[in-house]
Structure formats: structure tokens, C-alpha cells
């Protein structure tokens, strides 16, 4: 009996020890977790107000005496889409030194001739960039000029190409579209490490064109996101720049598409708001909020993560983010004819449904396609 009681006491002490350790750990780690959770809960609670009322826009509006900075073009192709029926005007945000990325895109999803001959669509693709920093010198600029003389697909304005000038690059894109290609049915902007399944995208946009879609803006939507107040983060936004606890809804800058009428409205709004907000996708959300445009979430536009590699995923994919070395291999695999046949028939549909559930419905956060994309 004593032995039994002794064991129970020992087990209770061990249990008490682990409970104490858990509580202490919880107390130590709860503060940053709590701050993160509370920050997002607070920002999401403000989301309706930020999206519905004009006080945010009023606080960011330019004074009548102020104008947006205007940078001259160093490289331009004003004739790129003149007198043509353009389905899609696609800007790729790139850095001067990223020649390898531009080259891979030209050989894969960014090949205009492929889209014209194989997909029966006229699209125009331009790489948008600023100037090399002072440390990179004139040599890189000379190489850019030489590259453009070969491919004729670069537009460049005279601002330093850097993270804090992303909004200047945003203004370059929408200004160019408004000035030189306002008749394009759709405008898309994408990073240079993105993969776009061009056959799927073109088929989707052609269907939308036929029904005359308007007020259209799709991508991977961030809802009620809070400004980052951590000074060590590159996304840090001081209160002086943006004092509200939540941003208007916006799409991830990795890739999004807007219709022609939205592109025109965004350009007009961009000329009235303070462009010191250097996070370009947030600035896009501010412009859209001013003109009453809300983004639509598309489950096959990825966030910051790569999609799982599998033909069942490729069947409906639109974009995937973070591709630096595998772009050409992925292009060959994702556009292979077998992809369109893999889910045919009853058993094909069941097979792909199960594969997508396994690949997309994971407990670990991937930031690519959501679980419900497996059922789309």
C-alpha cells in the first residue's frame, strides 16, 4: 500500500513539475505571441472602417501645392502596343542586375510569340525598373541598354532601383499604361521570381473579356493587415507615414490583375495620394480604396510561397512565387499536354482531389494555395 501511495505521489510531483514548466514557458513566450495576435485582431476589427470610409484617404491626400515626383524615361518603347488589340499588358518588376531572371522569363511564360501563336492572344510584356545604385556604376546601365536593344522590352525611369522606391516603380507602370496603352483589356503586374501559367491565365482572361467584366481586381488578398511597427523589419512603417491600425484590403504584389477601367481609376487616384508609402502593394490598396474598388481573392494566385509540384496542381494554377532556378523546368512540366488529361473521368477527378487535399491541406503554413483550392 505504501509503495502504491509513493508511486502516486511521485507521479503527481512529475505532473506538477511539467505543469509548472508549461506555465512558466507560456508566461515567457506569451507576450510576443499575444502582441502579434492582438495586433492582427485589432487591425481586423478596424478593417471595415478602413475599407468603408474616406478618413484614411483624406489623411494621405496630397495638398493642392504638392505634386508626385516625375522621373524622366531613360529607356522607353512608346510604340509597344499602339494601334493593336491588346488582351493583356504585363509589367514585370525587376532589378537592373537580374538579367538571368529576365532571360528565363523570355524563354518561358513571357514569350509573346508563344502566346500569339499557341494561345491566339496578343499580349505585351515590359520589364519595369529604375537605375543601378552608385556602387554598381555605369557599366550595368550600359549592359541594360544593350539588352534592350536586343529585346526591346525594358522601360526605365531615372530613380534608384531599391526596395524603398517600389512605389515609384508602381507609378511608372500605371503611368505608362495610362499614357501609351490605355486600350489594353487587362493590366497585370508581377515580380521577376514569379511563375505564371500563361495558358490558364489567357483562357481565364479571354472568358472575362467576352462578358465585358468591369471593376475587376484579382490576386492573393490580404485582409485587415496591420502596419509593421518593428523598426528592425524592412516593412517597418512609422506612424508619421501611416497612423491607422489596419491597411485597406490589398493583393500581394507578387502578381495581380486589374481590368482596363480599374487601371485608369488607379492611375487617377495615384496622382492624388502621398506616395511616401513605399510598400507598393499597400499603396495599390490605398489607391483602390479611394476609388471604391475591392480586391477579389483567387485561390490559384499564390502568396509568398511556391506551390507543390504535381500535375494535379498545375491543372488550374495561375501563379507561383519564389522561382529562381527552376523556371524553365517548371514551364515544361506545367504546360505538358498530360496535365490537361490527368483529371479526366471519374477516377481521374477522385485521384486529383485526393492529391490536392494531401498537398494543400497541411497543418504547416505554406502561403501558396489555400486548402479550399483542393475543392475548387
From Swiss-Prot:
Gene Ontology CC terms: Golgi membrane
Membrane topology note: Single-pass type II membrane protein
Residue ranges of the TM segments: 14-34
Primary localization class, coarse: Golgi
Keyword Transmembrane helix: yes
Any one GO biological process: central nervous system development
Tissue: Highly expressed in adult spleen, placenta and cerebellar Purkinje cells where it colocalizes with HNK-1. Expressed at lower level in brain, lung, thymus and muscle.
Keywords for the protein's UniProt record, in alphabetical order: Developmental protein, Glycoprotein, Glycosyltransferase, Golgi apparatus, Lipid metabolism, Membrane, Signal-anchor, Transferase, Transmembrane, Transmembrane helix
Pfam families according to UniProt: Galactosyl_T
UniProt keyword Methyltransferase, yes or no: no
Record-stated family: Belongs to the glycosyltransferase 31 family.
Protein name: Lactosylceramide 1,3-N-acetyl-beta-D-glucosaminyltransferase
The organism of origin for this protein: Mus musculus
Higher taxonomy: Eukaryota, Metazoa, Chordata, Craniata, Vertebrata
Gene: B3gnt5
Amino acid at each position: 500500500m505504501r509503495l502504491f501511495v509513493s508511486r502516486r505521489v511521485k507521479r503527481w510531483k512529475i505532473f506538477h513539475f511539467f505543469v509548472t514548466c508549461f506555465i512558466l514557458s507560456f508566461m515567457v513566450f506569451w507576450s510576443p505571441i499575444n502582441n502579434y495576435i492582438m495586433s492582427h485582431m485589432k487591425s481586423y476589427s478596424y478593417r471595415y472602417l478602413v475599407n468603408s470610409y474616406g478618413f484614411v484617404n483624406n489623411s494621405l491626400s496630397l495638398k493642392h501645392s504638392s505634386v508626385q515626383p516625375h522621373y524622366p524615361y531613360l529607356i522607353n518603347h512608346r510604340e509597344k502596343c499602339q494601334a493593336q488589340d491588346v488582351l493583356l499588358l504585363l509589367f514585370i518588376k525587376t532589378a537592373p542586375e537580374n538579367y538571368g531572371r529576365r532571360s528565363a522569363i523570355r524563354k518561358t511564360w513571357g514569350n509573346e510569340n508563344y502566346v500569339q501563336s499557341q494561345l491566339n492572344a496578343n499580349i505585351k510584356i515590359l520589364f519595369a525598373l529604375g537605375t543601378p545604385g552608385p556602387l554598381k556604376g555605369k557599366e550595368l546601365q550600359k549592359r541594360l541598354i544593350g539588352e534592350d536593344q536586343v529585346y526591346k522590352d525594358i522601360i526605365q525611369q531615372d530613380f534608384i532601383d531599391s526596395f524603398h522606391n517600389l512605389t515609384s516603380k508602381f507609378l511608372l507602370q500605371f503611368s505608362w499604361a495610362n499614357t501609351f496603352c490605355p486600350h489594353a483589356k487587362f493590366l497585370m503586374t508581377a515580380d521577376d521570381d514569379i511563375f505564371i501559367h500563361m495558358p490558364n491565365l489567357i483562357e481565364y482572361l479571354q472568358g472575362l473579356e467576352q462578358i465585358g467584366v468591369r471593376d475587376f481586381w484579382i490576386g492573393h488578398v490580404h485582409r485587415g493587415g496591420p502596419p509593421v511597427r518593428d523598426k528592425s523589419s524592412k516593412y517597418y512603417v512609422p506612424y508619421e507615414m501611416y497612423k491607422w491600425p489596419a491597411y485597406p484590403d490589398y493583393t500581394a504584389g507578387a502578381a495581380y490583375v486589374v481590368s482596363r477601367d480599374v487601371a485608369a481609376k488607379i492611375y487617377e487616384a495615384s496622382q492624388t495620394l502621398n506616395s511616401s508609402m513605399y510598400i507598393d502593394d499597400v499603396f495599390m490598396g490605398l489607391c483602390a480604396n479611394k476609388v471604391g474598388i475591392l480586391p477579389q481573392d483567387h485561390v490559384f494566385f499564390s502568396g509568398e510561397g511556391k506551390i507543390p509540384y504535381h500535375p494535379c496542381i498545375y491543372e488550374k494554377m495561375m501563379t507561383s512565387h519564389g522561382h529562381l532556378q527552376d523556371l524553365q523546368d517548371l514551364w515544361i512540366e506545367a504546360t505538358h499536354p498530360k496535365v490537361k488529361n490527368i483529371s479526366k473521368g471519374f477516377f481521374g477527378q477522385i485521384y486529383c482531389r485526393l492529391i490536392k487535399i494531401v498537398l494543400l491541406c497541411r497543418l504547416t503554413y505554406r502561403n501558396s494555395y489555400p486548402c479550399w483550392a483542393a475543392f475548387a
